[in-house]
């Protein structure tokens, strides 16, 4: 496995692979990899001949008061994860390699990005769409792998690829959880011991909501109220949003009559965590 920092080198290597008829899988990340990322890399390795993992903390998807400067970074640790999971190249560019000083072109999306995380982080998805488009252009993979924990992001990337006729297959992979149900996240490292215990309230609330739907409840407002009550029982938790939306359009639904995404964002102390489940009727 190699670590590559330049766009030119990644392109040259992928070009060689494709000249030999090899399929290329791609896993874009911001680093500080956990078992969720590892599962994406392993799946990419199983389904492709070669795998590229990008590690780039993308500055343009962070808001002015968000955690860009404190986002955890550990390339040595990440390299070991990538190599053991089957990656062939880590693409680890500097900011200057990805963005010219006078960079002024962005990829934006209407509708799908308005609610959920887009509502409280209004510039986030413009940054995500822009960097993912750039990475797709640089790596030119056959398939790209994203985790379902970031369900809105996955829907946005699928729509972007469709709308812009990008010839890459987008594959969503299941959420990987800790033994107590907390979704794996690089931001879990921010949590104190007390906050880490409190964070289990996210999965507990969603589990109860899923059971309620399975028992026949179809009123979205009742599901939202149930989740709200459970989360508010934890003194360290502060709700950002609780939504029941169409799993494709991300539009709110009043009644659960087709495939829906039940998604939440909750602050545990100062750390914002997200979780979700999809319910298919």
Feature roles, as predicted:
Residues 2-236, 245-247:
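Nucleotidyltransferase catalytic core that binds NTPs
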Residues 226-281:
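Phosphate/ribose-recognition catalytic cores of enzymes acting on nucleotide-derived substrates
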């Amino acid at each position: 496995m190699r670590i590559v920092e330049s766009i030119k080198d990644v392109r040259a290597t992928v070009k060689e692979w494709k000249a030999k008829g090899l399929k290329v899988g791609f896993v874009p990340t911001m680093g500080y990899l956990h078992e969720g990322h590892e599962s994406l890399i392993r799946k990419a390795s199983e389904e492709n001949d070669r795998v590229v993992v990008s590690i780039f903390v993308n500055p343009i998807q962070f808001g002015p008061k968000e955690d860009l400067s404190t986002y955890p970074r550990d390339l040595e640790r990440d390299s070991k994860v990538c190599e053991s999971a089957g990656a062939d190249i880590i693409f680890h560019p500097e900011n200057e390699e990805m963005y010219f000083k006078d960079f002024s072109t962005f990829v934006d999306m209407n509708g799908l990005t308005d609610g959920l995380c887009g509502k409280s982080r209004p510039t986030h998805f413009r940054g995500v769409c822009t960097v993912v488009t750039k990475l797709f252009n640089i790596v030119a993979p056959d398939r790209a792998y994203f985790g379902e924990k970031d369900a809105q992001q996955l829907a946005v990337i699928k729509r972007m690829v469709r709308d812009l006729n990008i010839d890459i297959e987008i594959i969503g992979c299941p959420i990987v959880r800790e033994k107590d149900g907390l979704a794996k996240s690089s931001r879990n490292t921010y949590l104190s011991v007390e906050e880490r215990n409190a964070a289990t309230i996210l999965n507990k609330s969603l589990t109860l909501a899923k059971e309620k739907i399975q028992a026949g409840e179809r009123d979205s407002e009742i599901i939202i109220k149930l989740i709200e009550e459970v989360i508010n029982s934890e003194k360290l938790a502060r709700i950002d949003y609780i939504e029941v939306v169409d799993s494709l359009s991300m539009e709110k639904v009043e009644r659960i009559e087709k495939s829906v995404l039940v998604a939440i964002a909750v602050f545990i102390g100062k750390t914002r965590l997200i979780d979700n489940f999809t319910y298919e009727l």
